[in-house]
Amino acid sequence: MPAPLKGSFESLARQNEKTEEDGLERILDEQDLQDRIDHKMLVPVPVSASLSINNNLAETHRYVRPWTATFLGDLSKAHAQRFDGPIQVTSAVRTVDYQKQLMHVNGNATQAEGDVVSPHLTGATIDIGKNTMTRAELAWMRNFLLPLQLDGKIDVEEEFRQACFHITVYKSYAPPLSPAAPVIAARKARSKAGAQVASTDDPQ
């Protein structure tokens, strides 16, 4: 069994630094959150047969950054190739106001204000529940996540009181397409279509 991916204050500080480098701001309240949803800065958690979400989360708290959604899609598809049943997102975006409330009921909750705060406030972070995972699934998750952490694409803190994988995904996980990428893709599509037409026209 691979060792747990334990967190540390250094890891939390790094998550704050890197999300700031990614240009992400802390989401203050529900109005601020709704504005970012309306402007497509946050997208829905990509729920599917292989990825579920905690039904207790408010509708507006079921959103993440686009690259975090891409990561969740990749993770859930890879998990589904090995195991039955979906993985579950137990927490996604939070606001500063919500985090303050959480601190009153959860002694494990990270600060809402200051230099080092919960990266959930940026929308880049999700929690994946561990309660229903088998030992084989836990081992698989650790083996899947560790290389991405070593590559600087994510940071992981395996929590035990809340029984989850706390994962912050960085923008570099799914960098935006370059301006030329759509043009190149269109050329490739046209070239492929032309080749198919030529093949159809060939005499038998």
Where are these regions (language model features)?
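Extracytoplasmic cell-surface/polysaccharide-interacting catalytic and binding patches
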Residues: M1-L72, P147, E157-A163, T168-A189, ...
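Solvent-exposed, acidic/flexible segments
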Residues: L57, H61-L72, A92-T95, P119-L121, ...
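Short secondary-structure capping micro-motifs at structural edges
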Residues: E59-T60, G73-A78, E113-G114
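Solvent-exposed, polar/charged alpha-helical surfaces in well-ordered, non-transmembrane soluble domains
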Residues: A69-G73, K77, K100, A139, ...
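Sec-exported extracytoplasmic/periplasmic mature domains
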Residues: K77-D84, Y98, G107, L146, ...
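Acidic helix-start/capping segments at beta-turn-to-alpha-helix junctions
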Residues: G85-L102
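Charged, often glycine-rich, active-site loop that binds/positions anionic groups
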Residues: D97-E113
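Catalytic cores and adjacent binding grooves of peptidoglycan-active enzymes
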Residues: T110-Q204
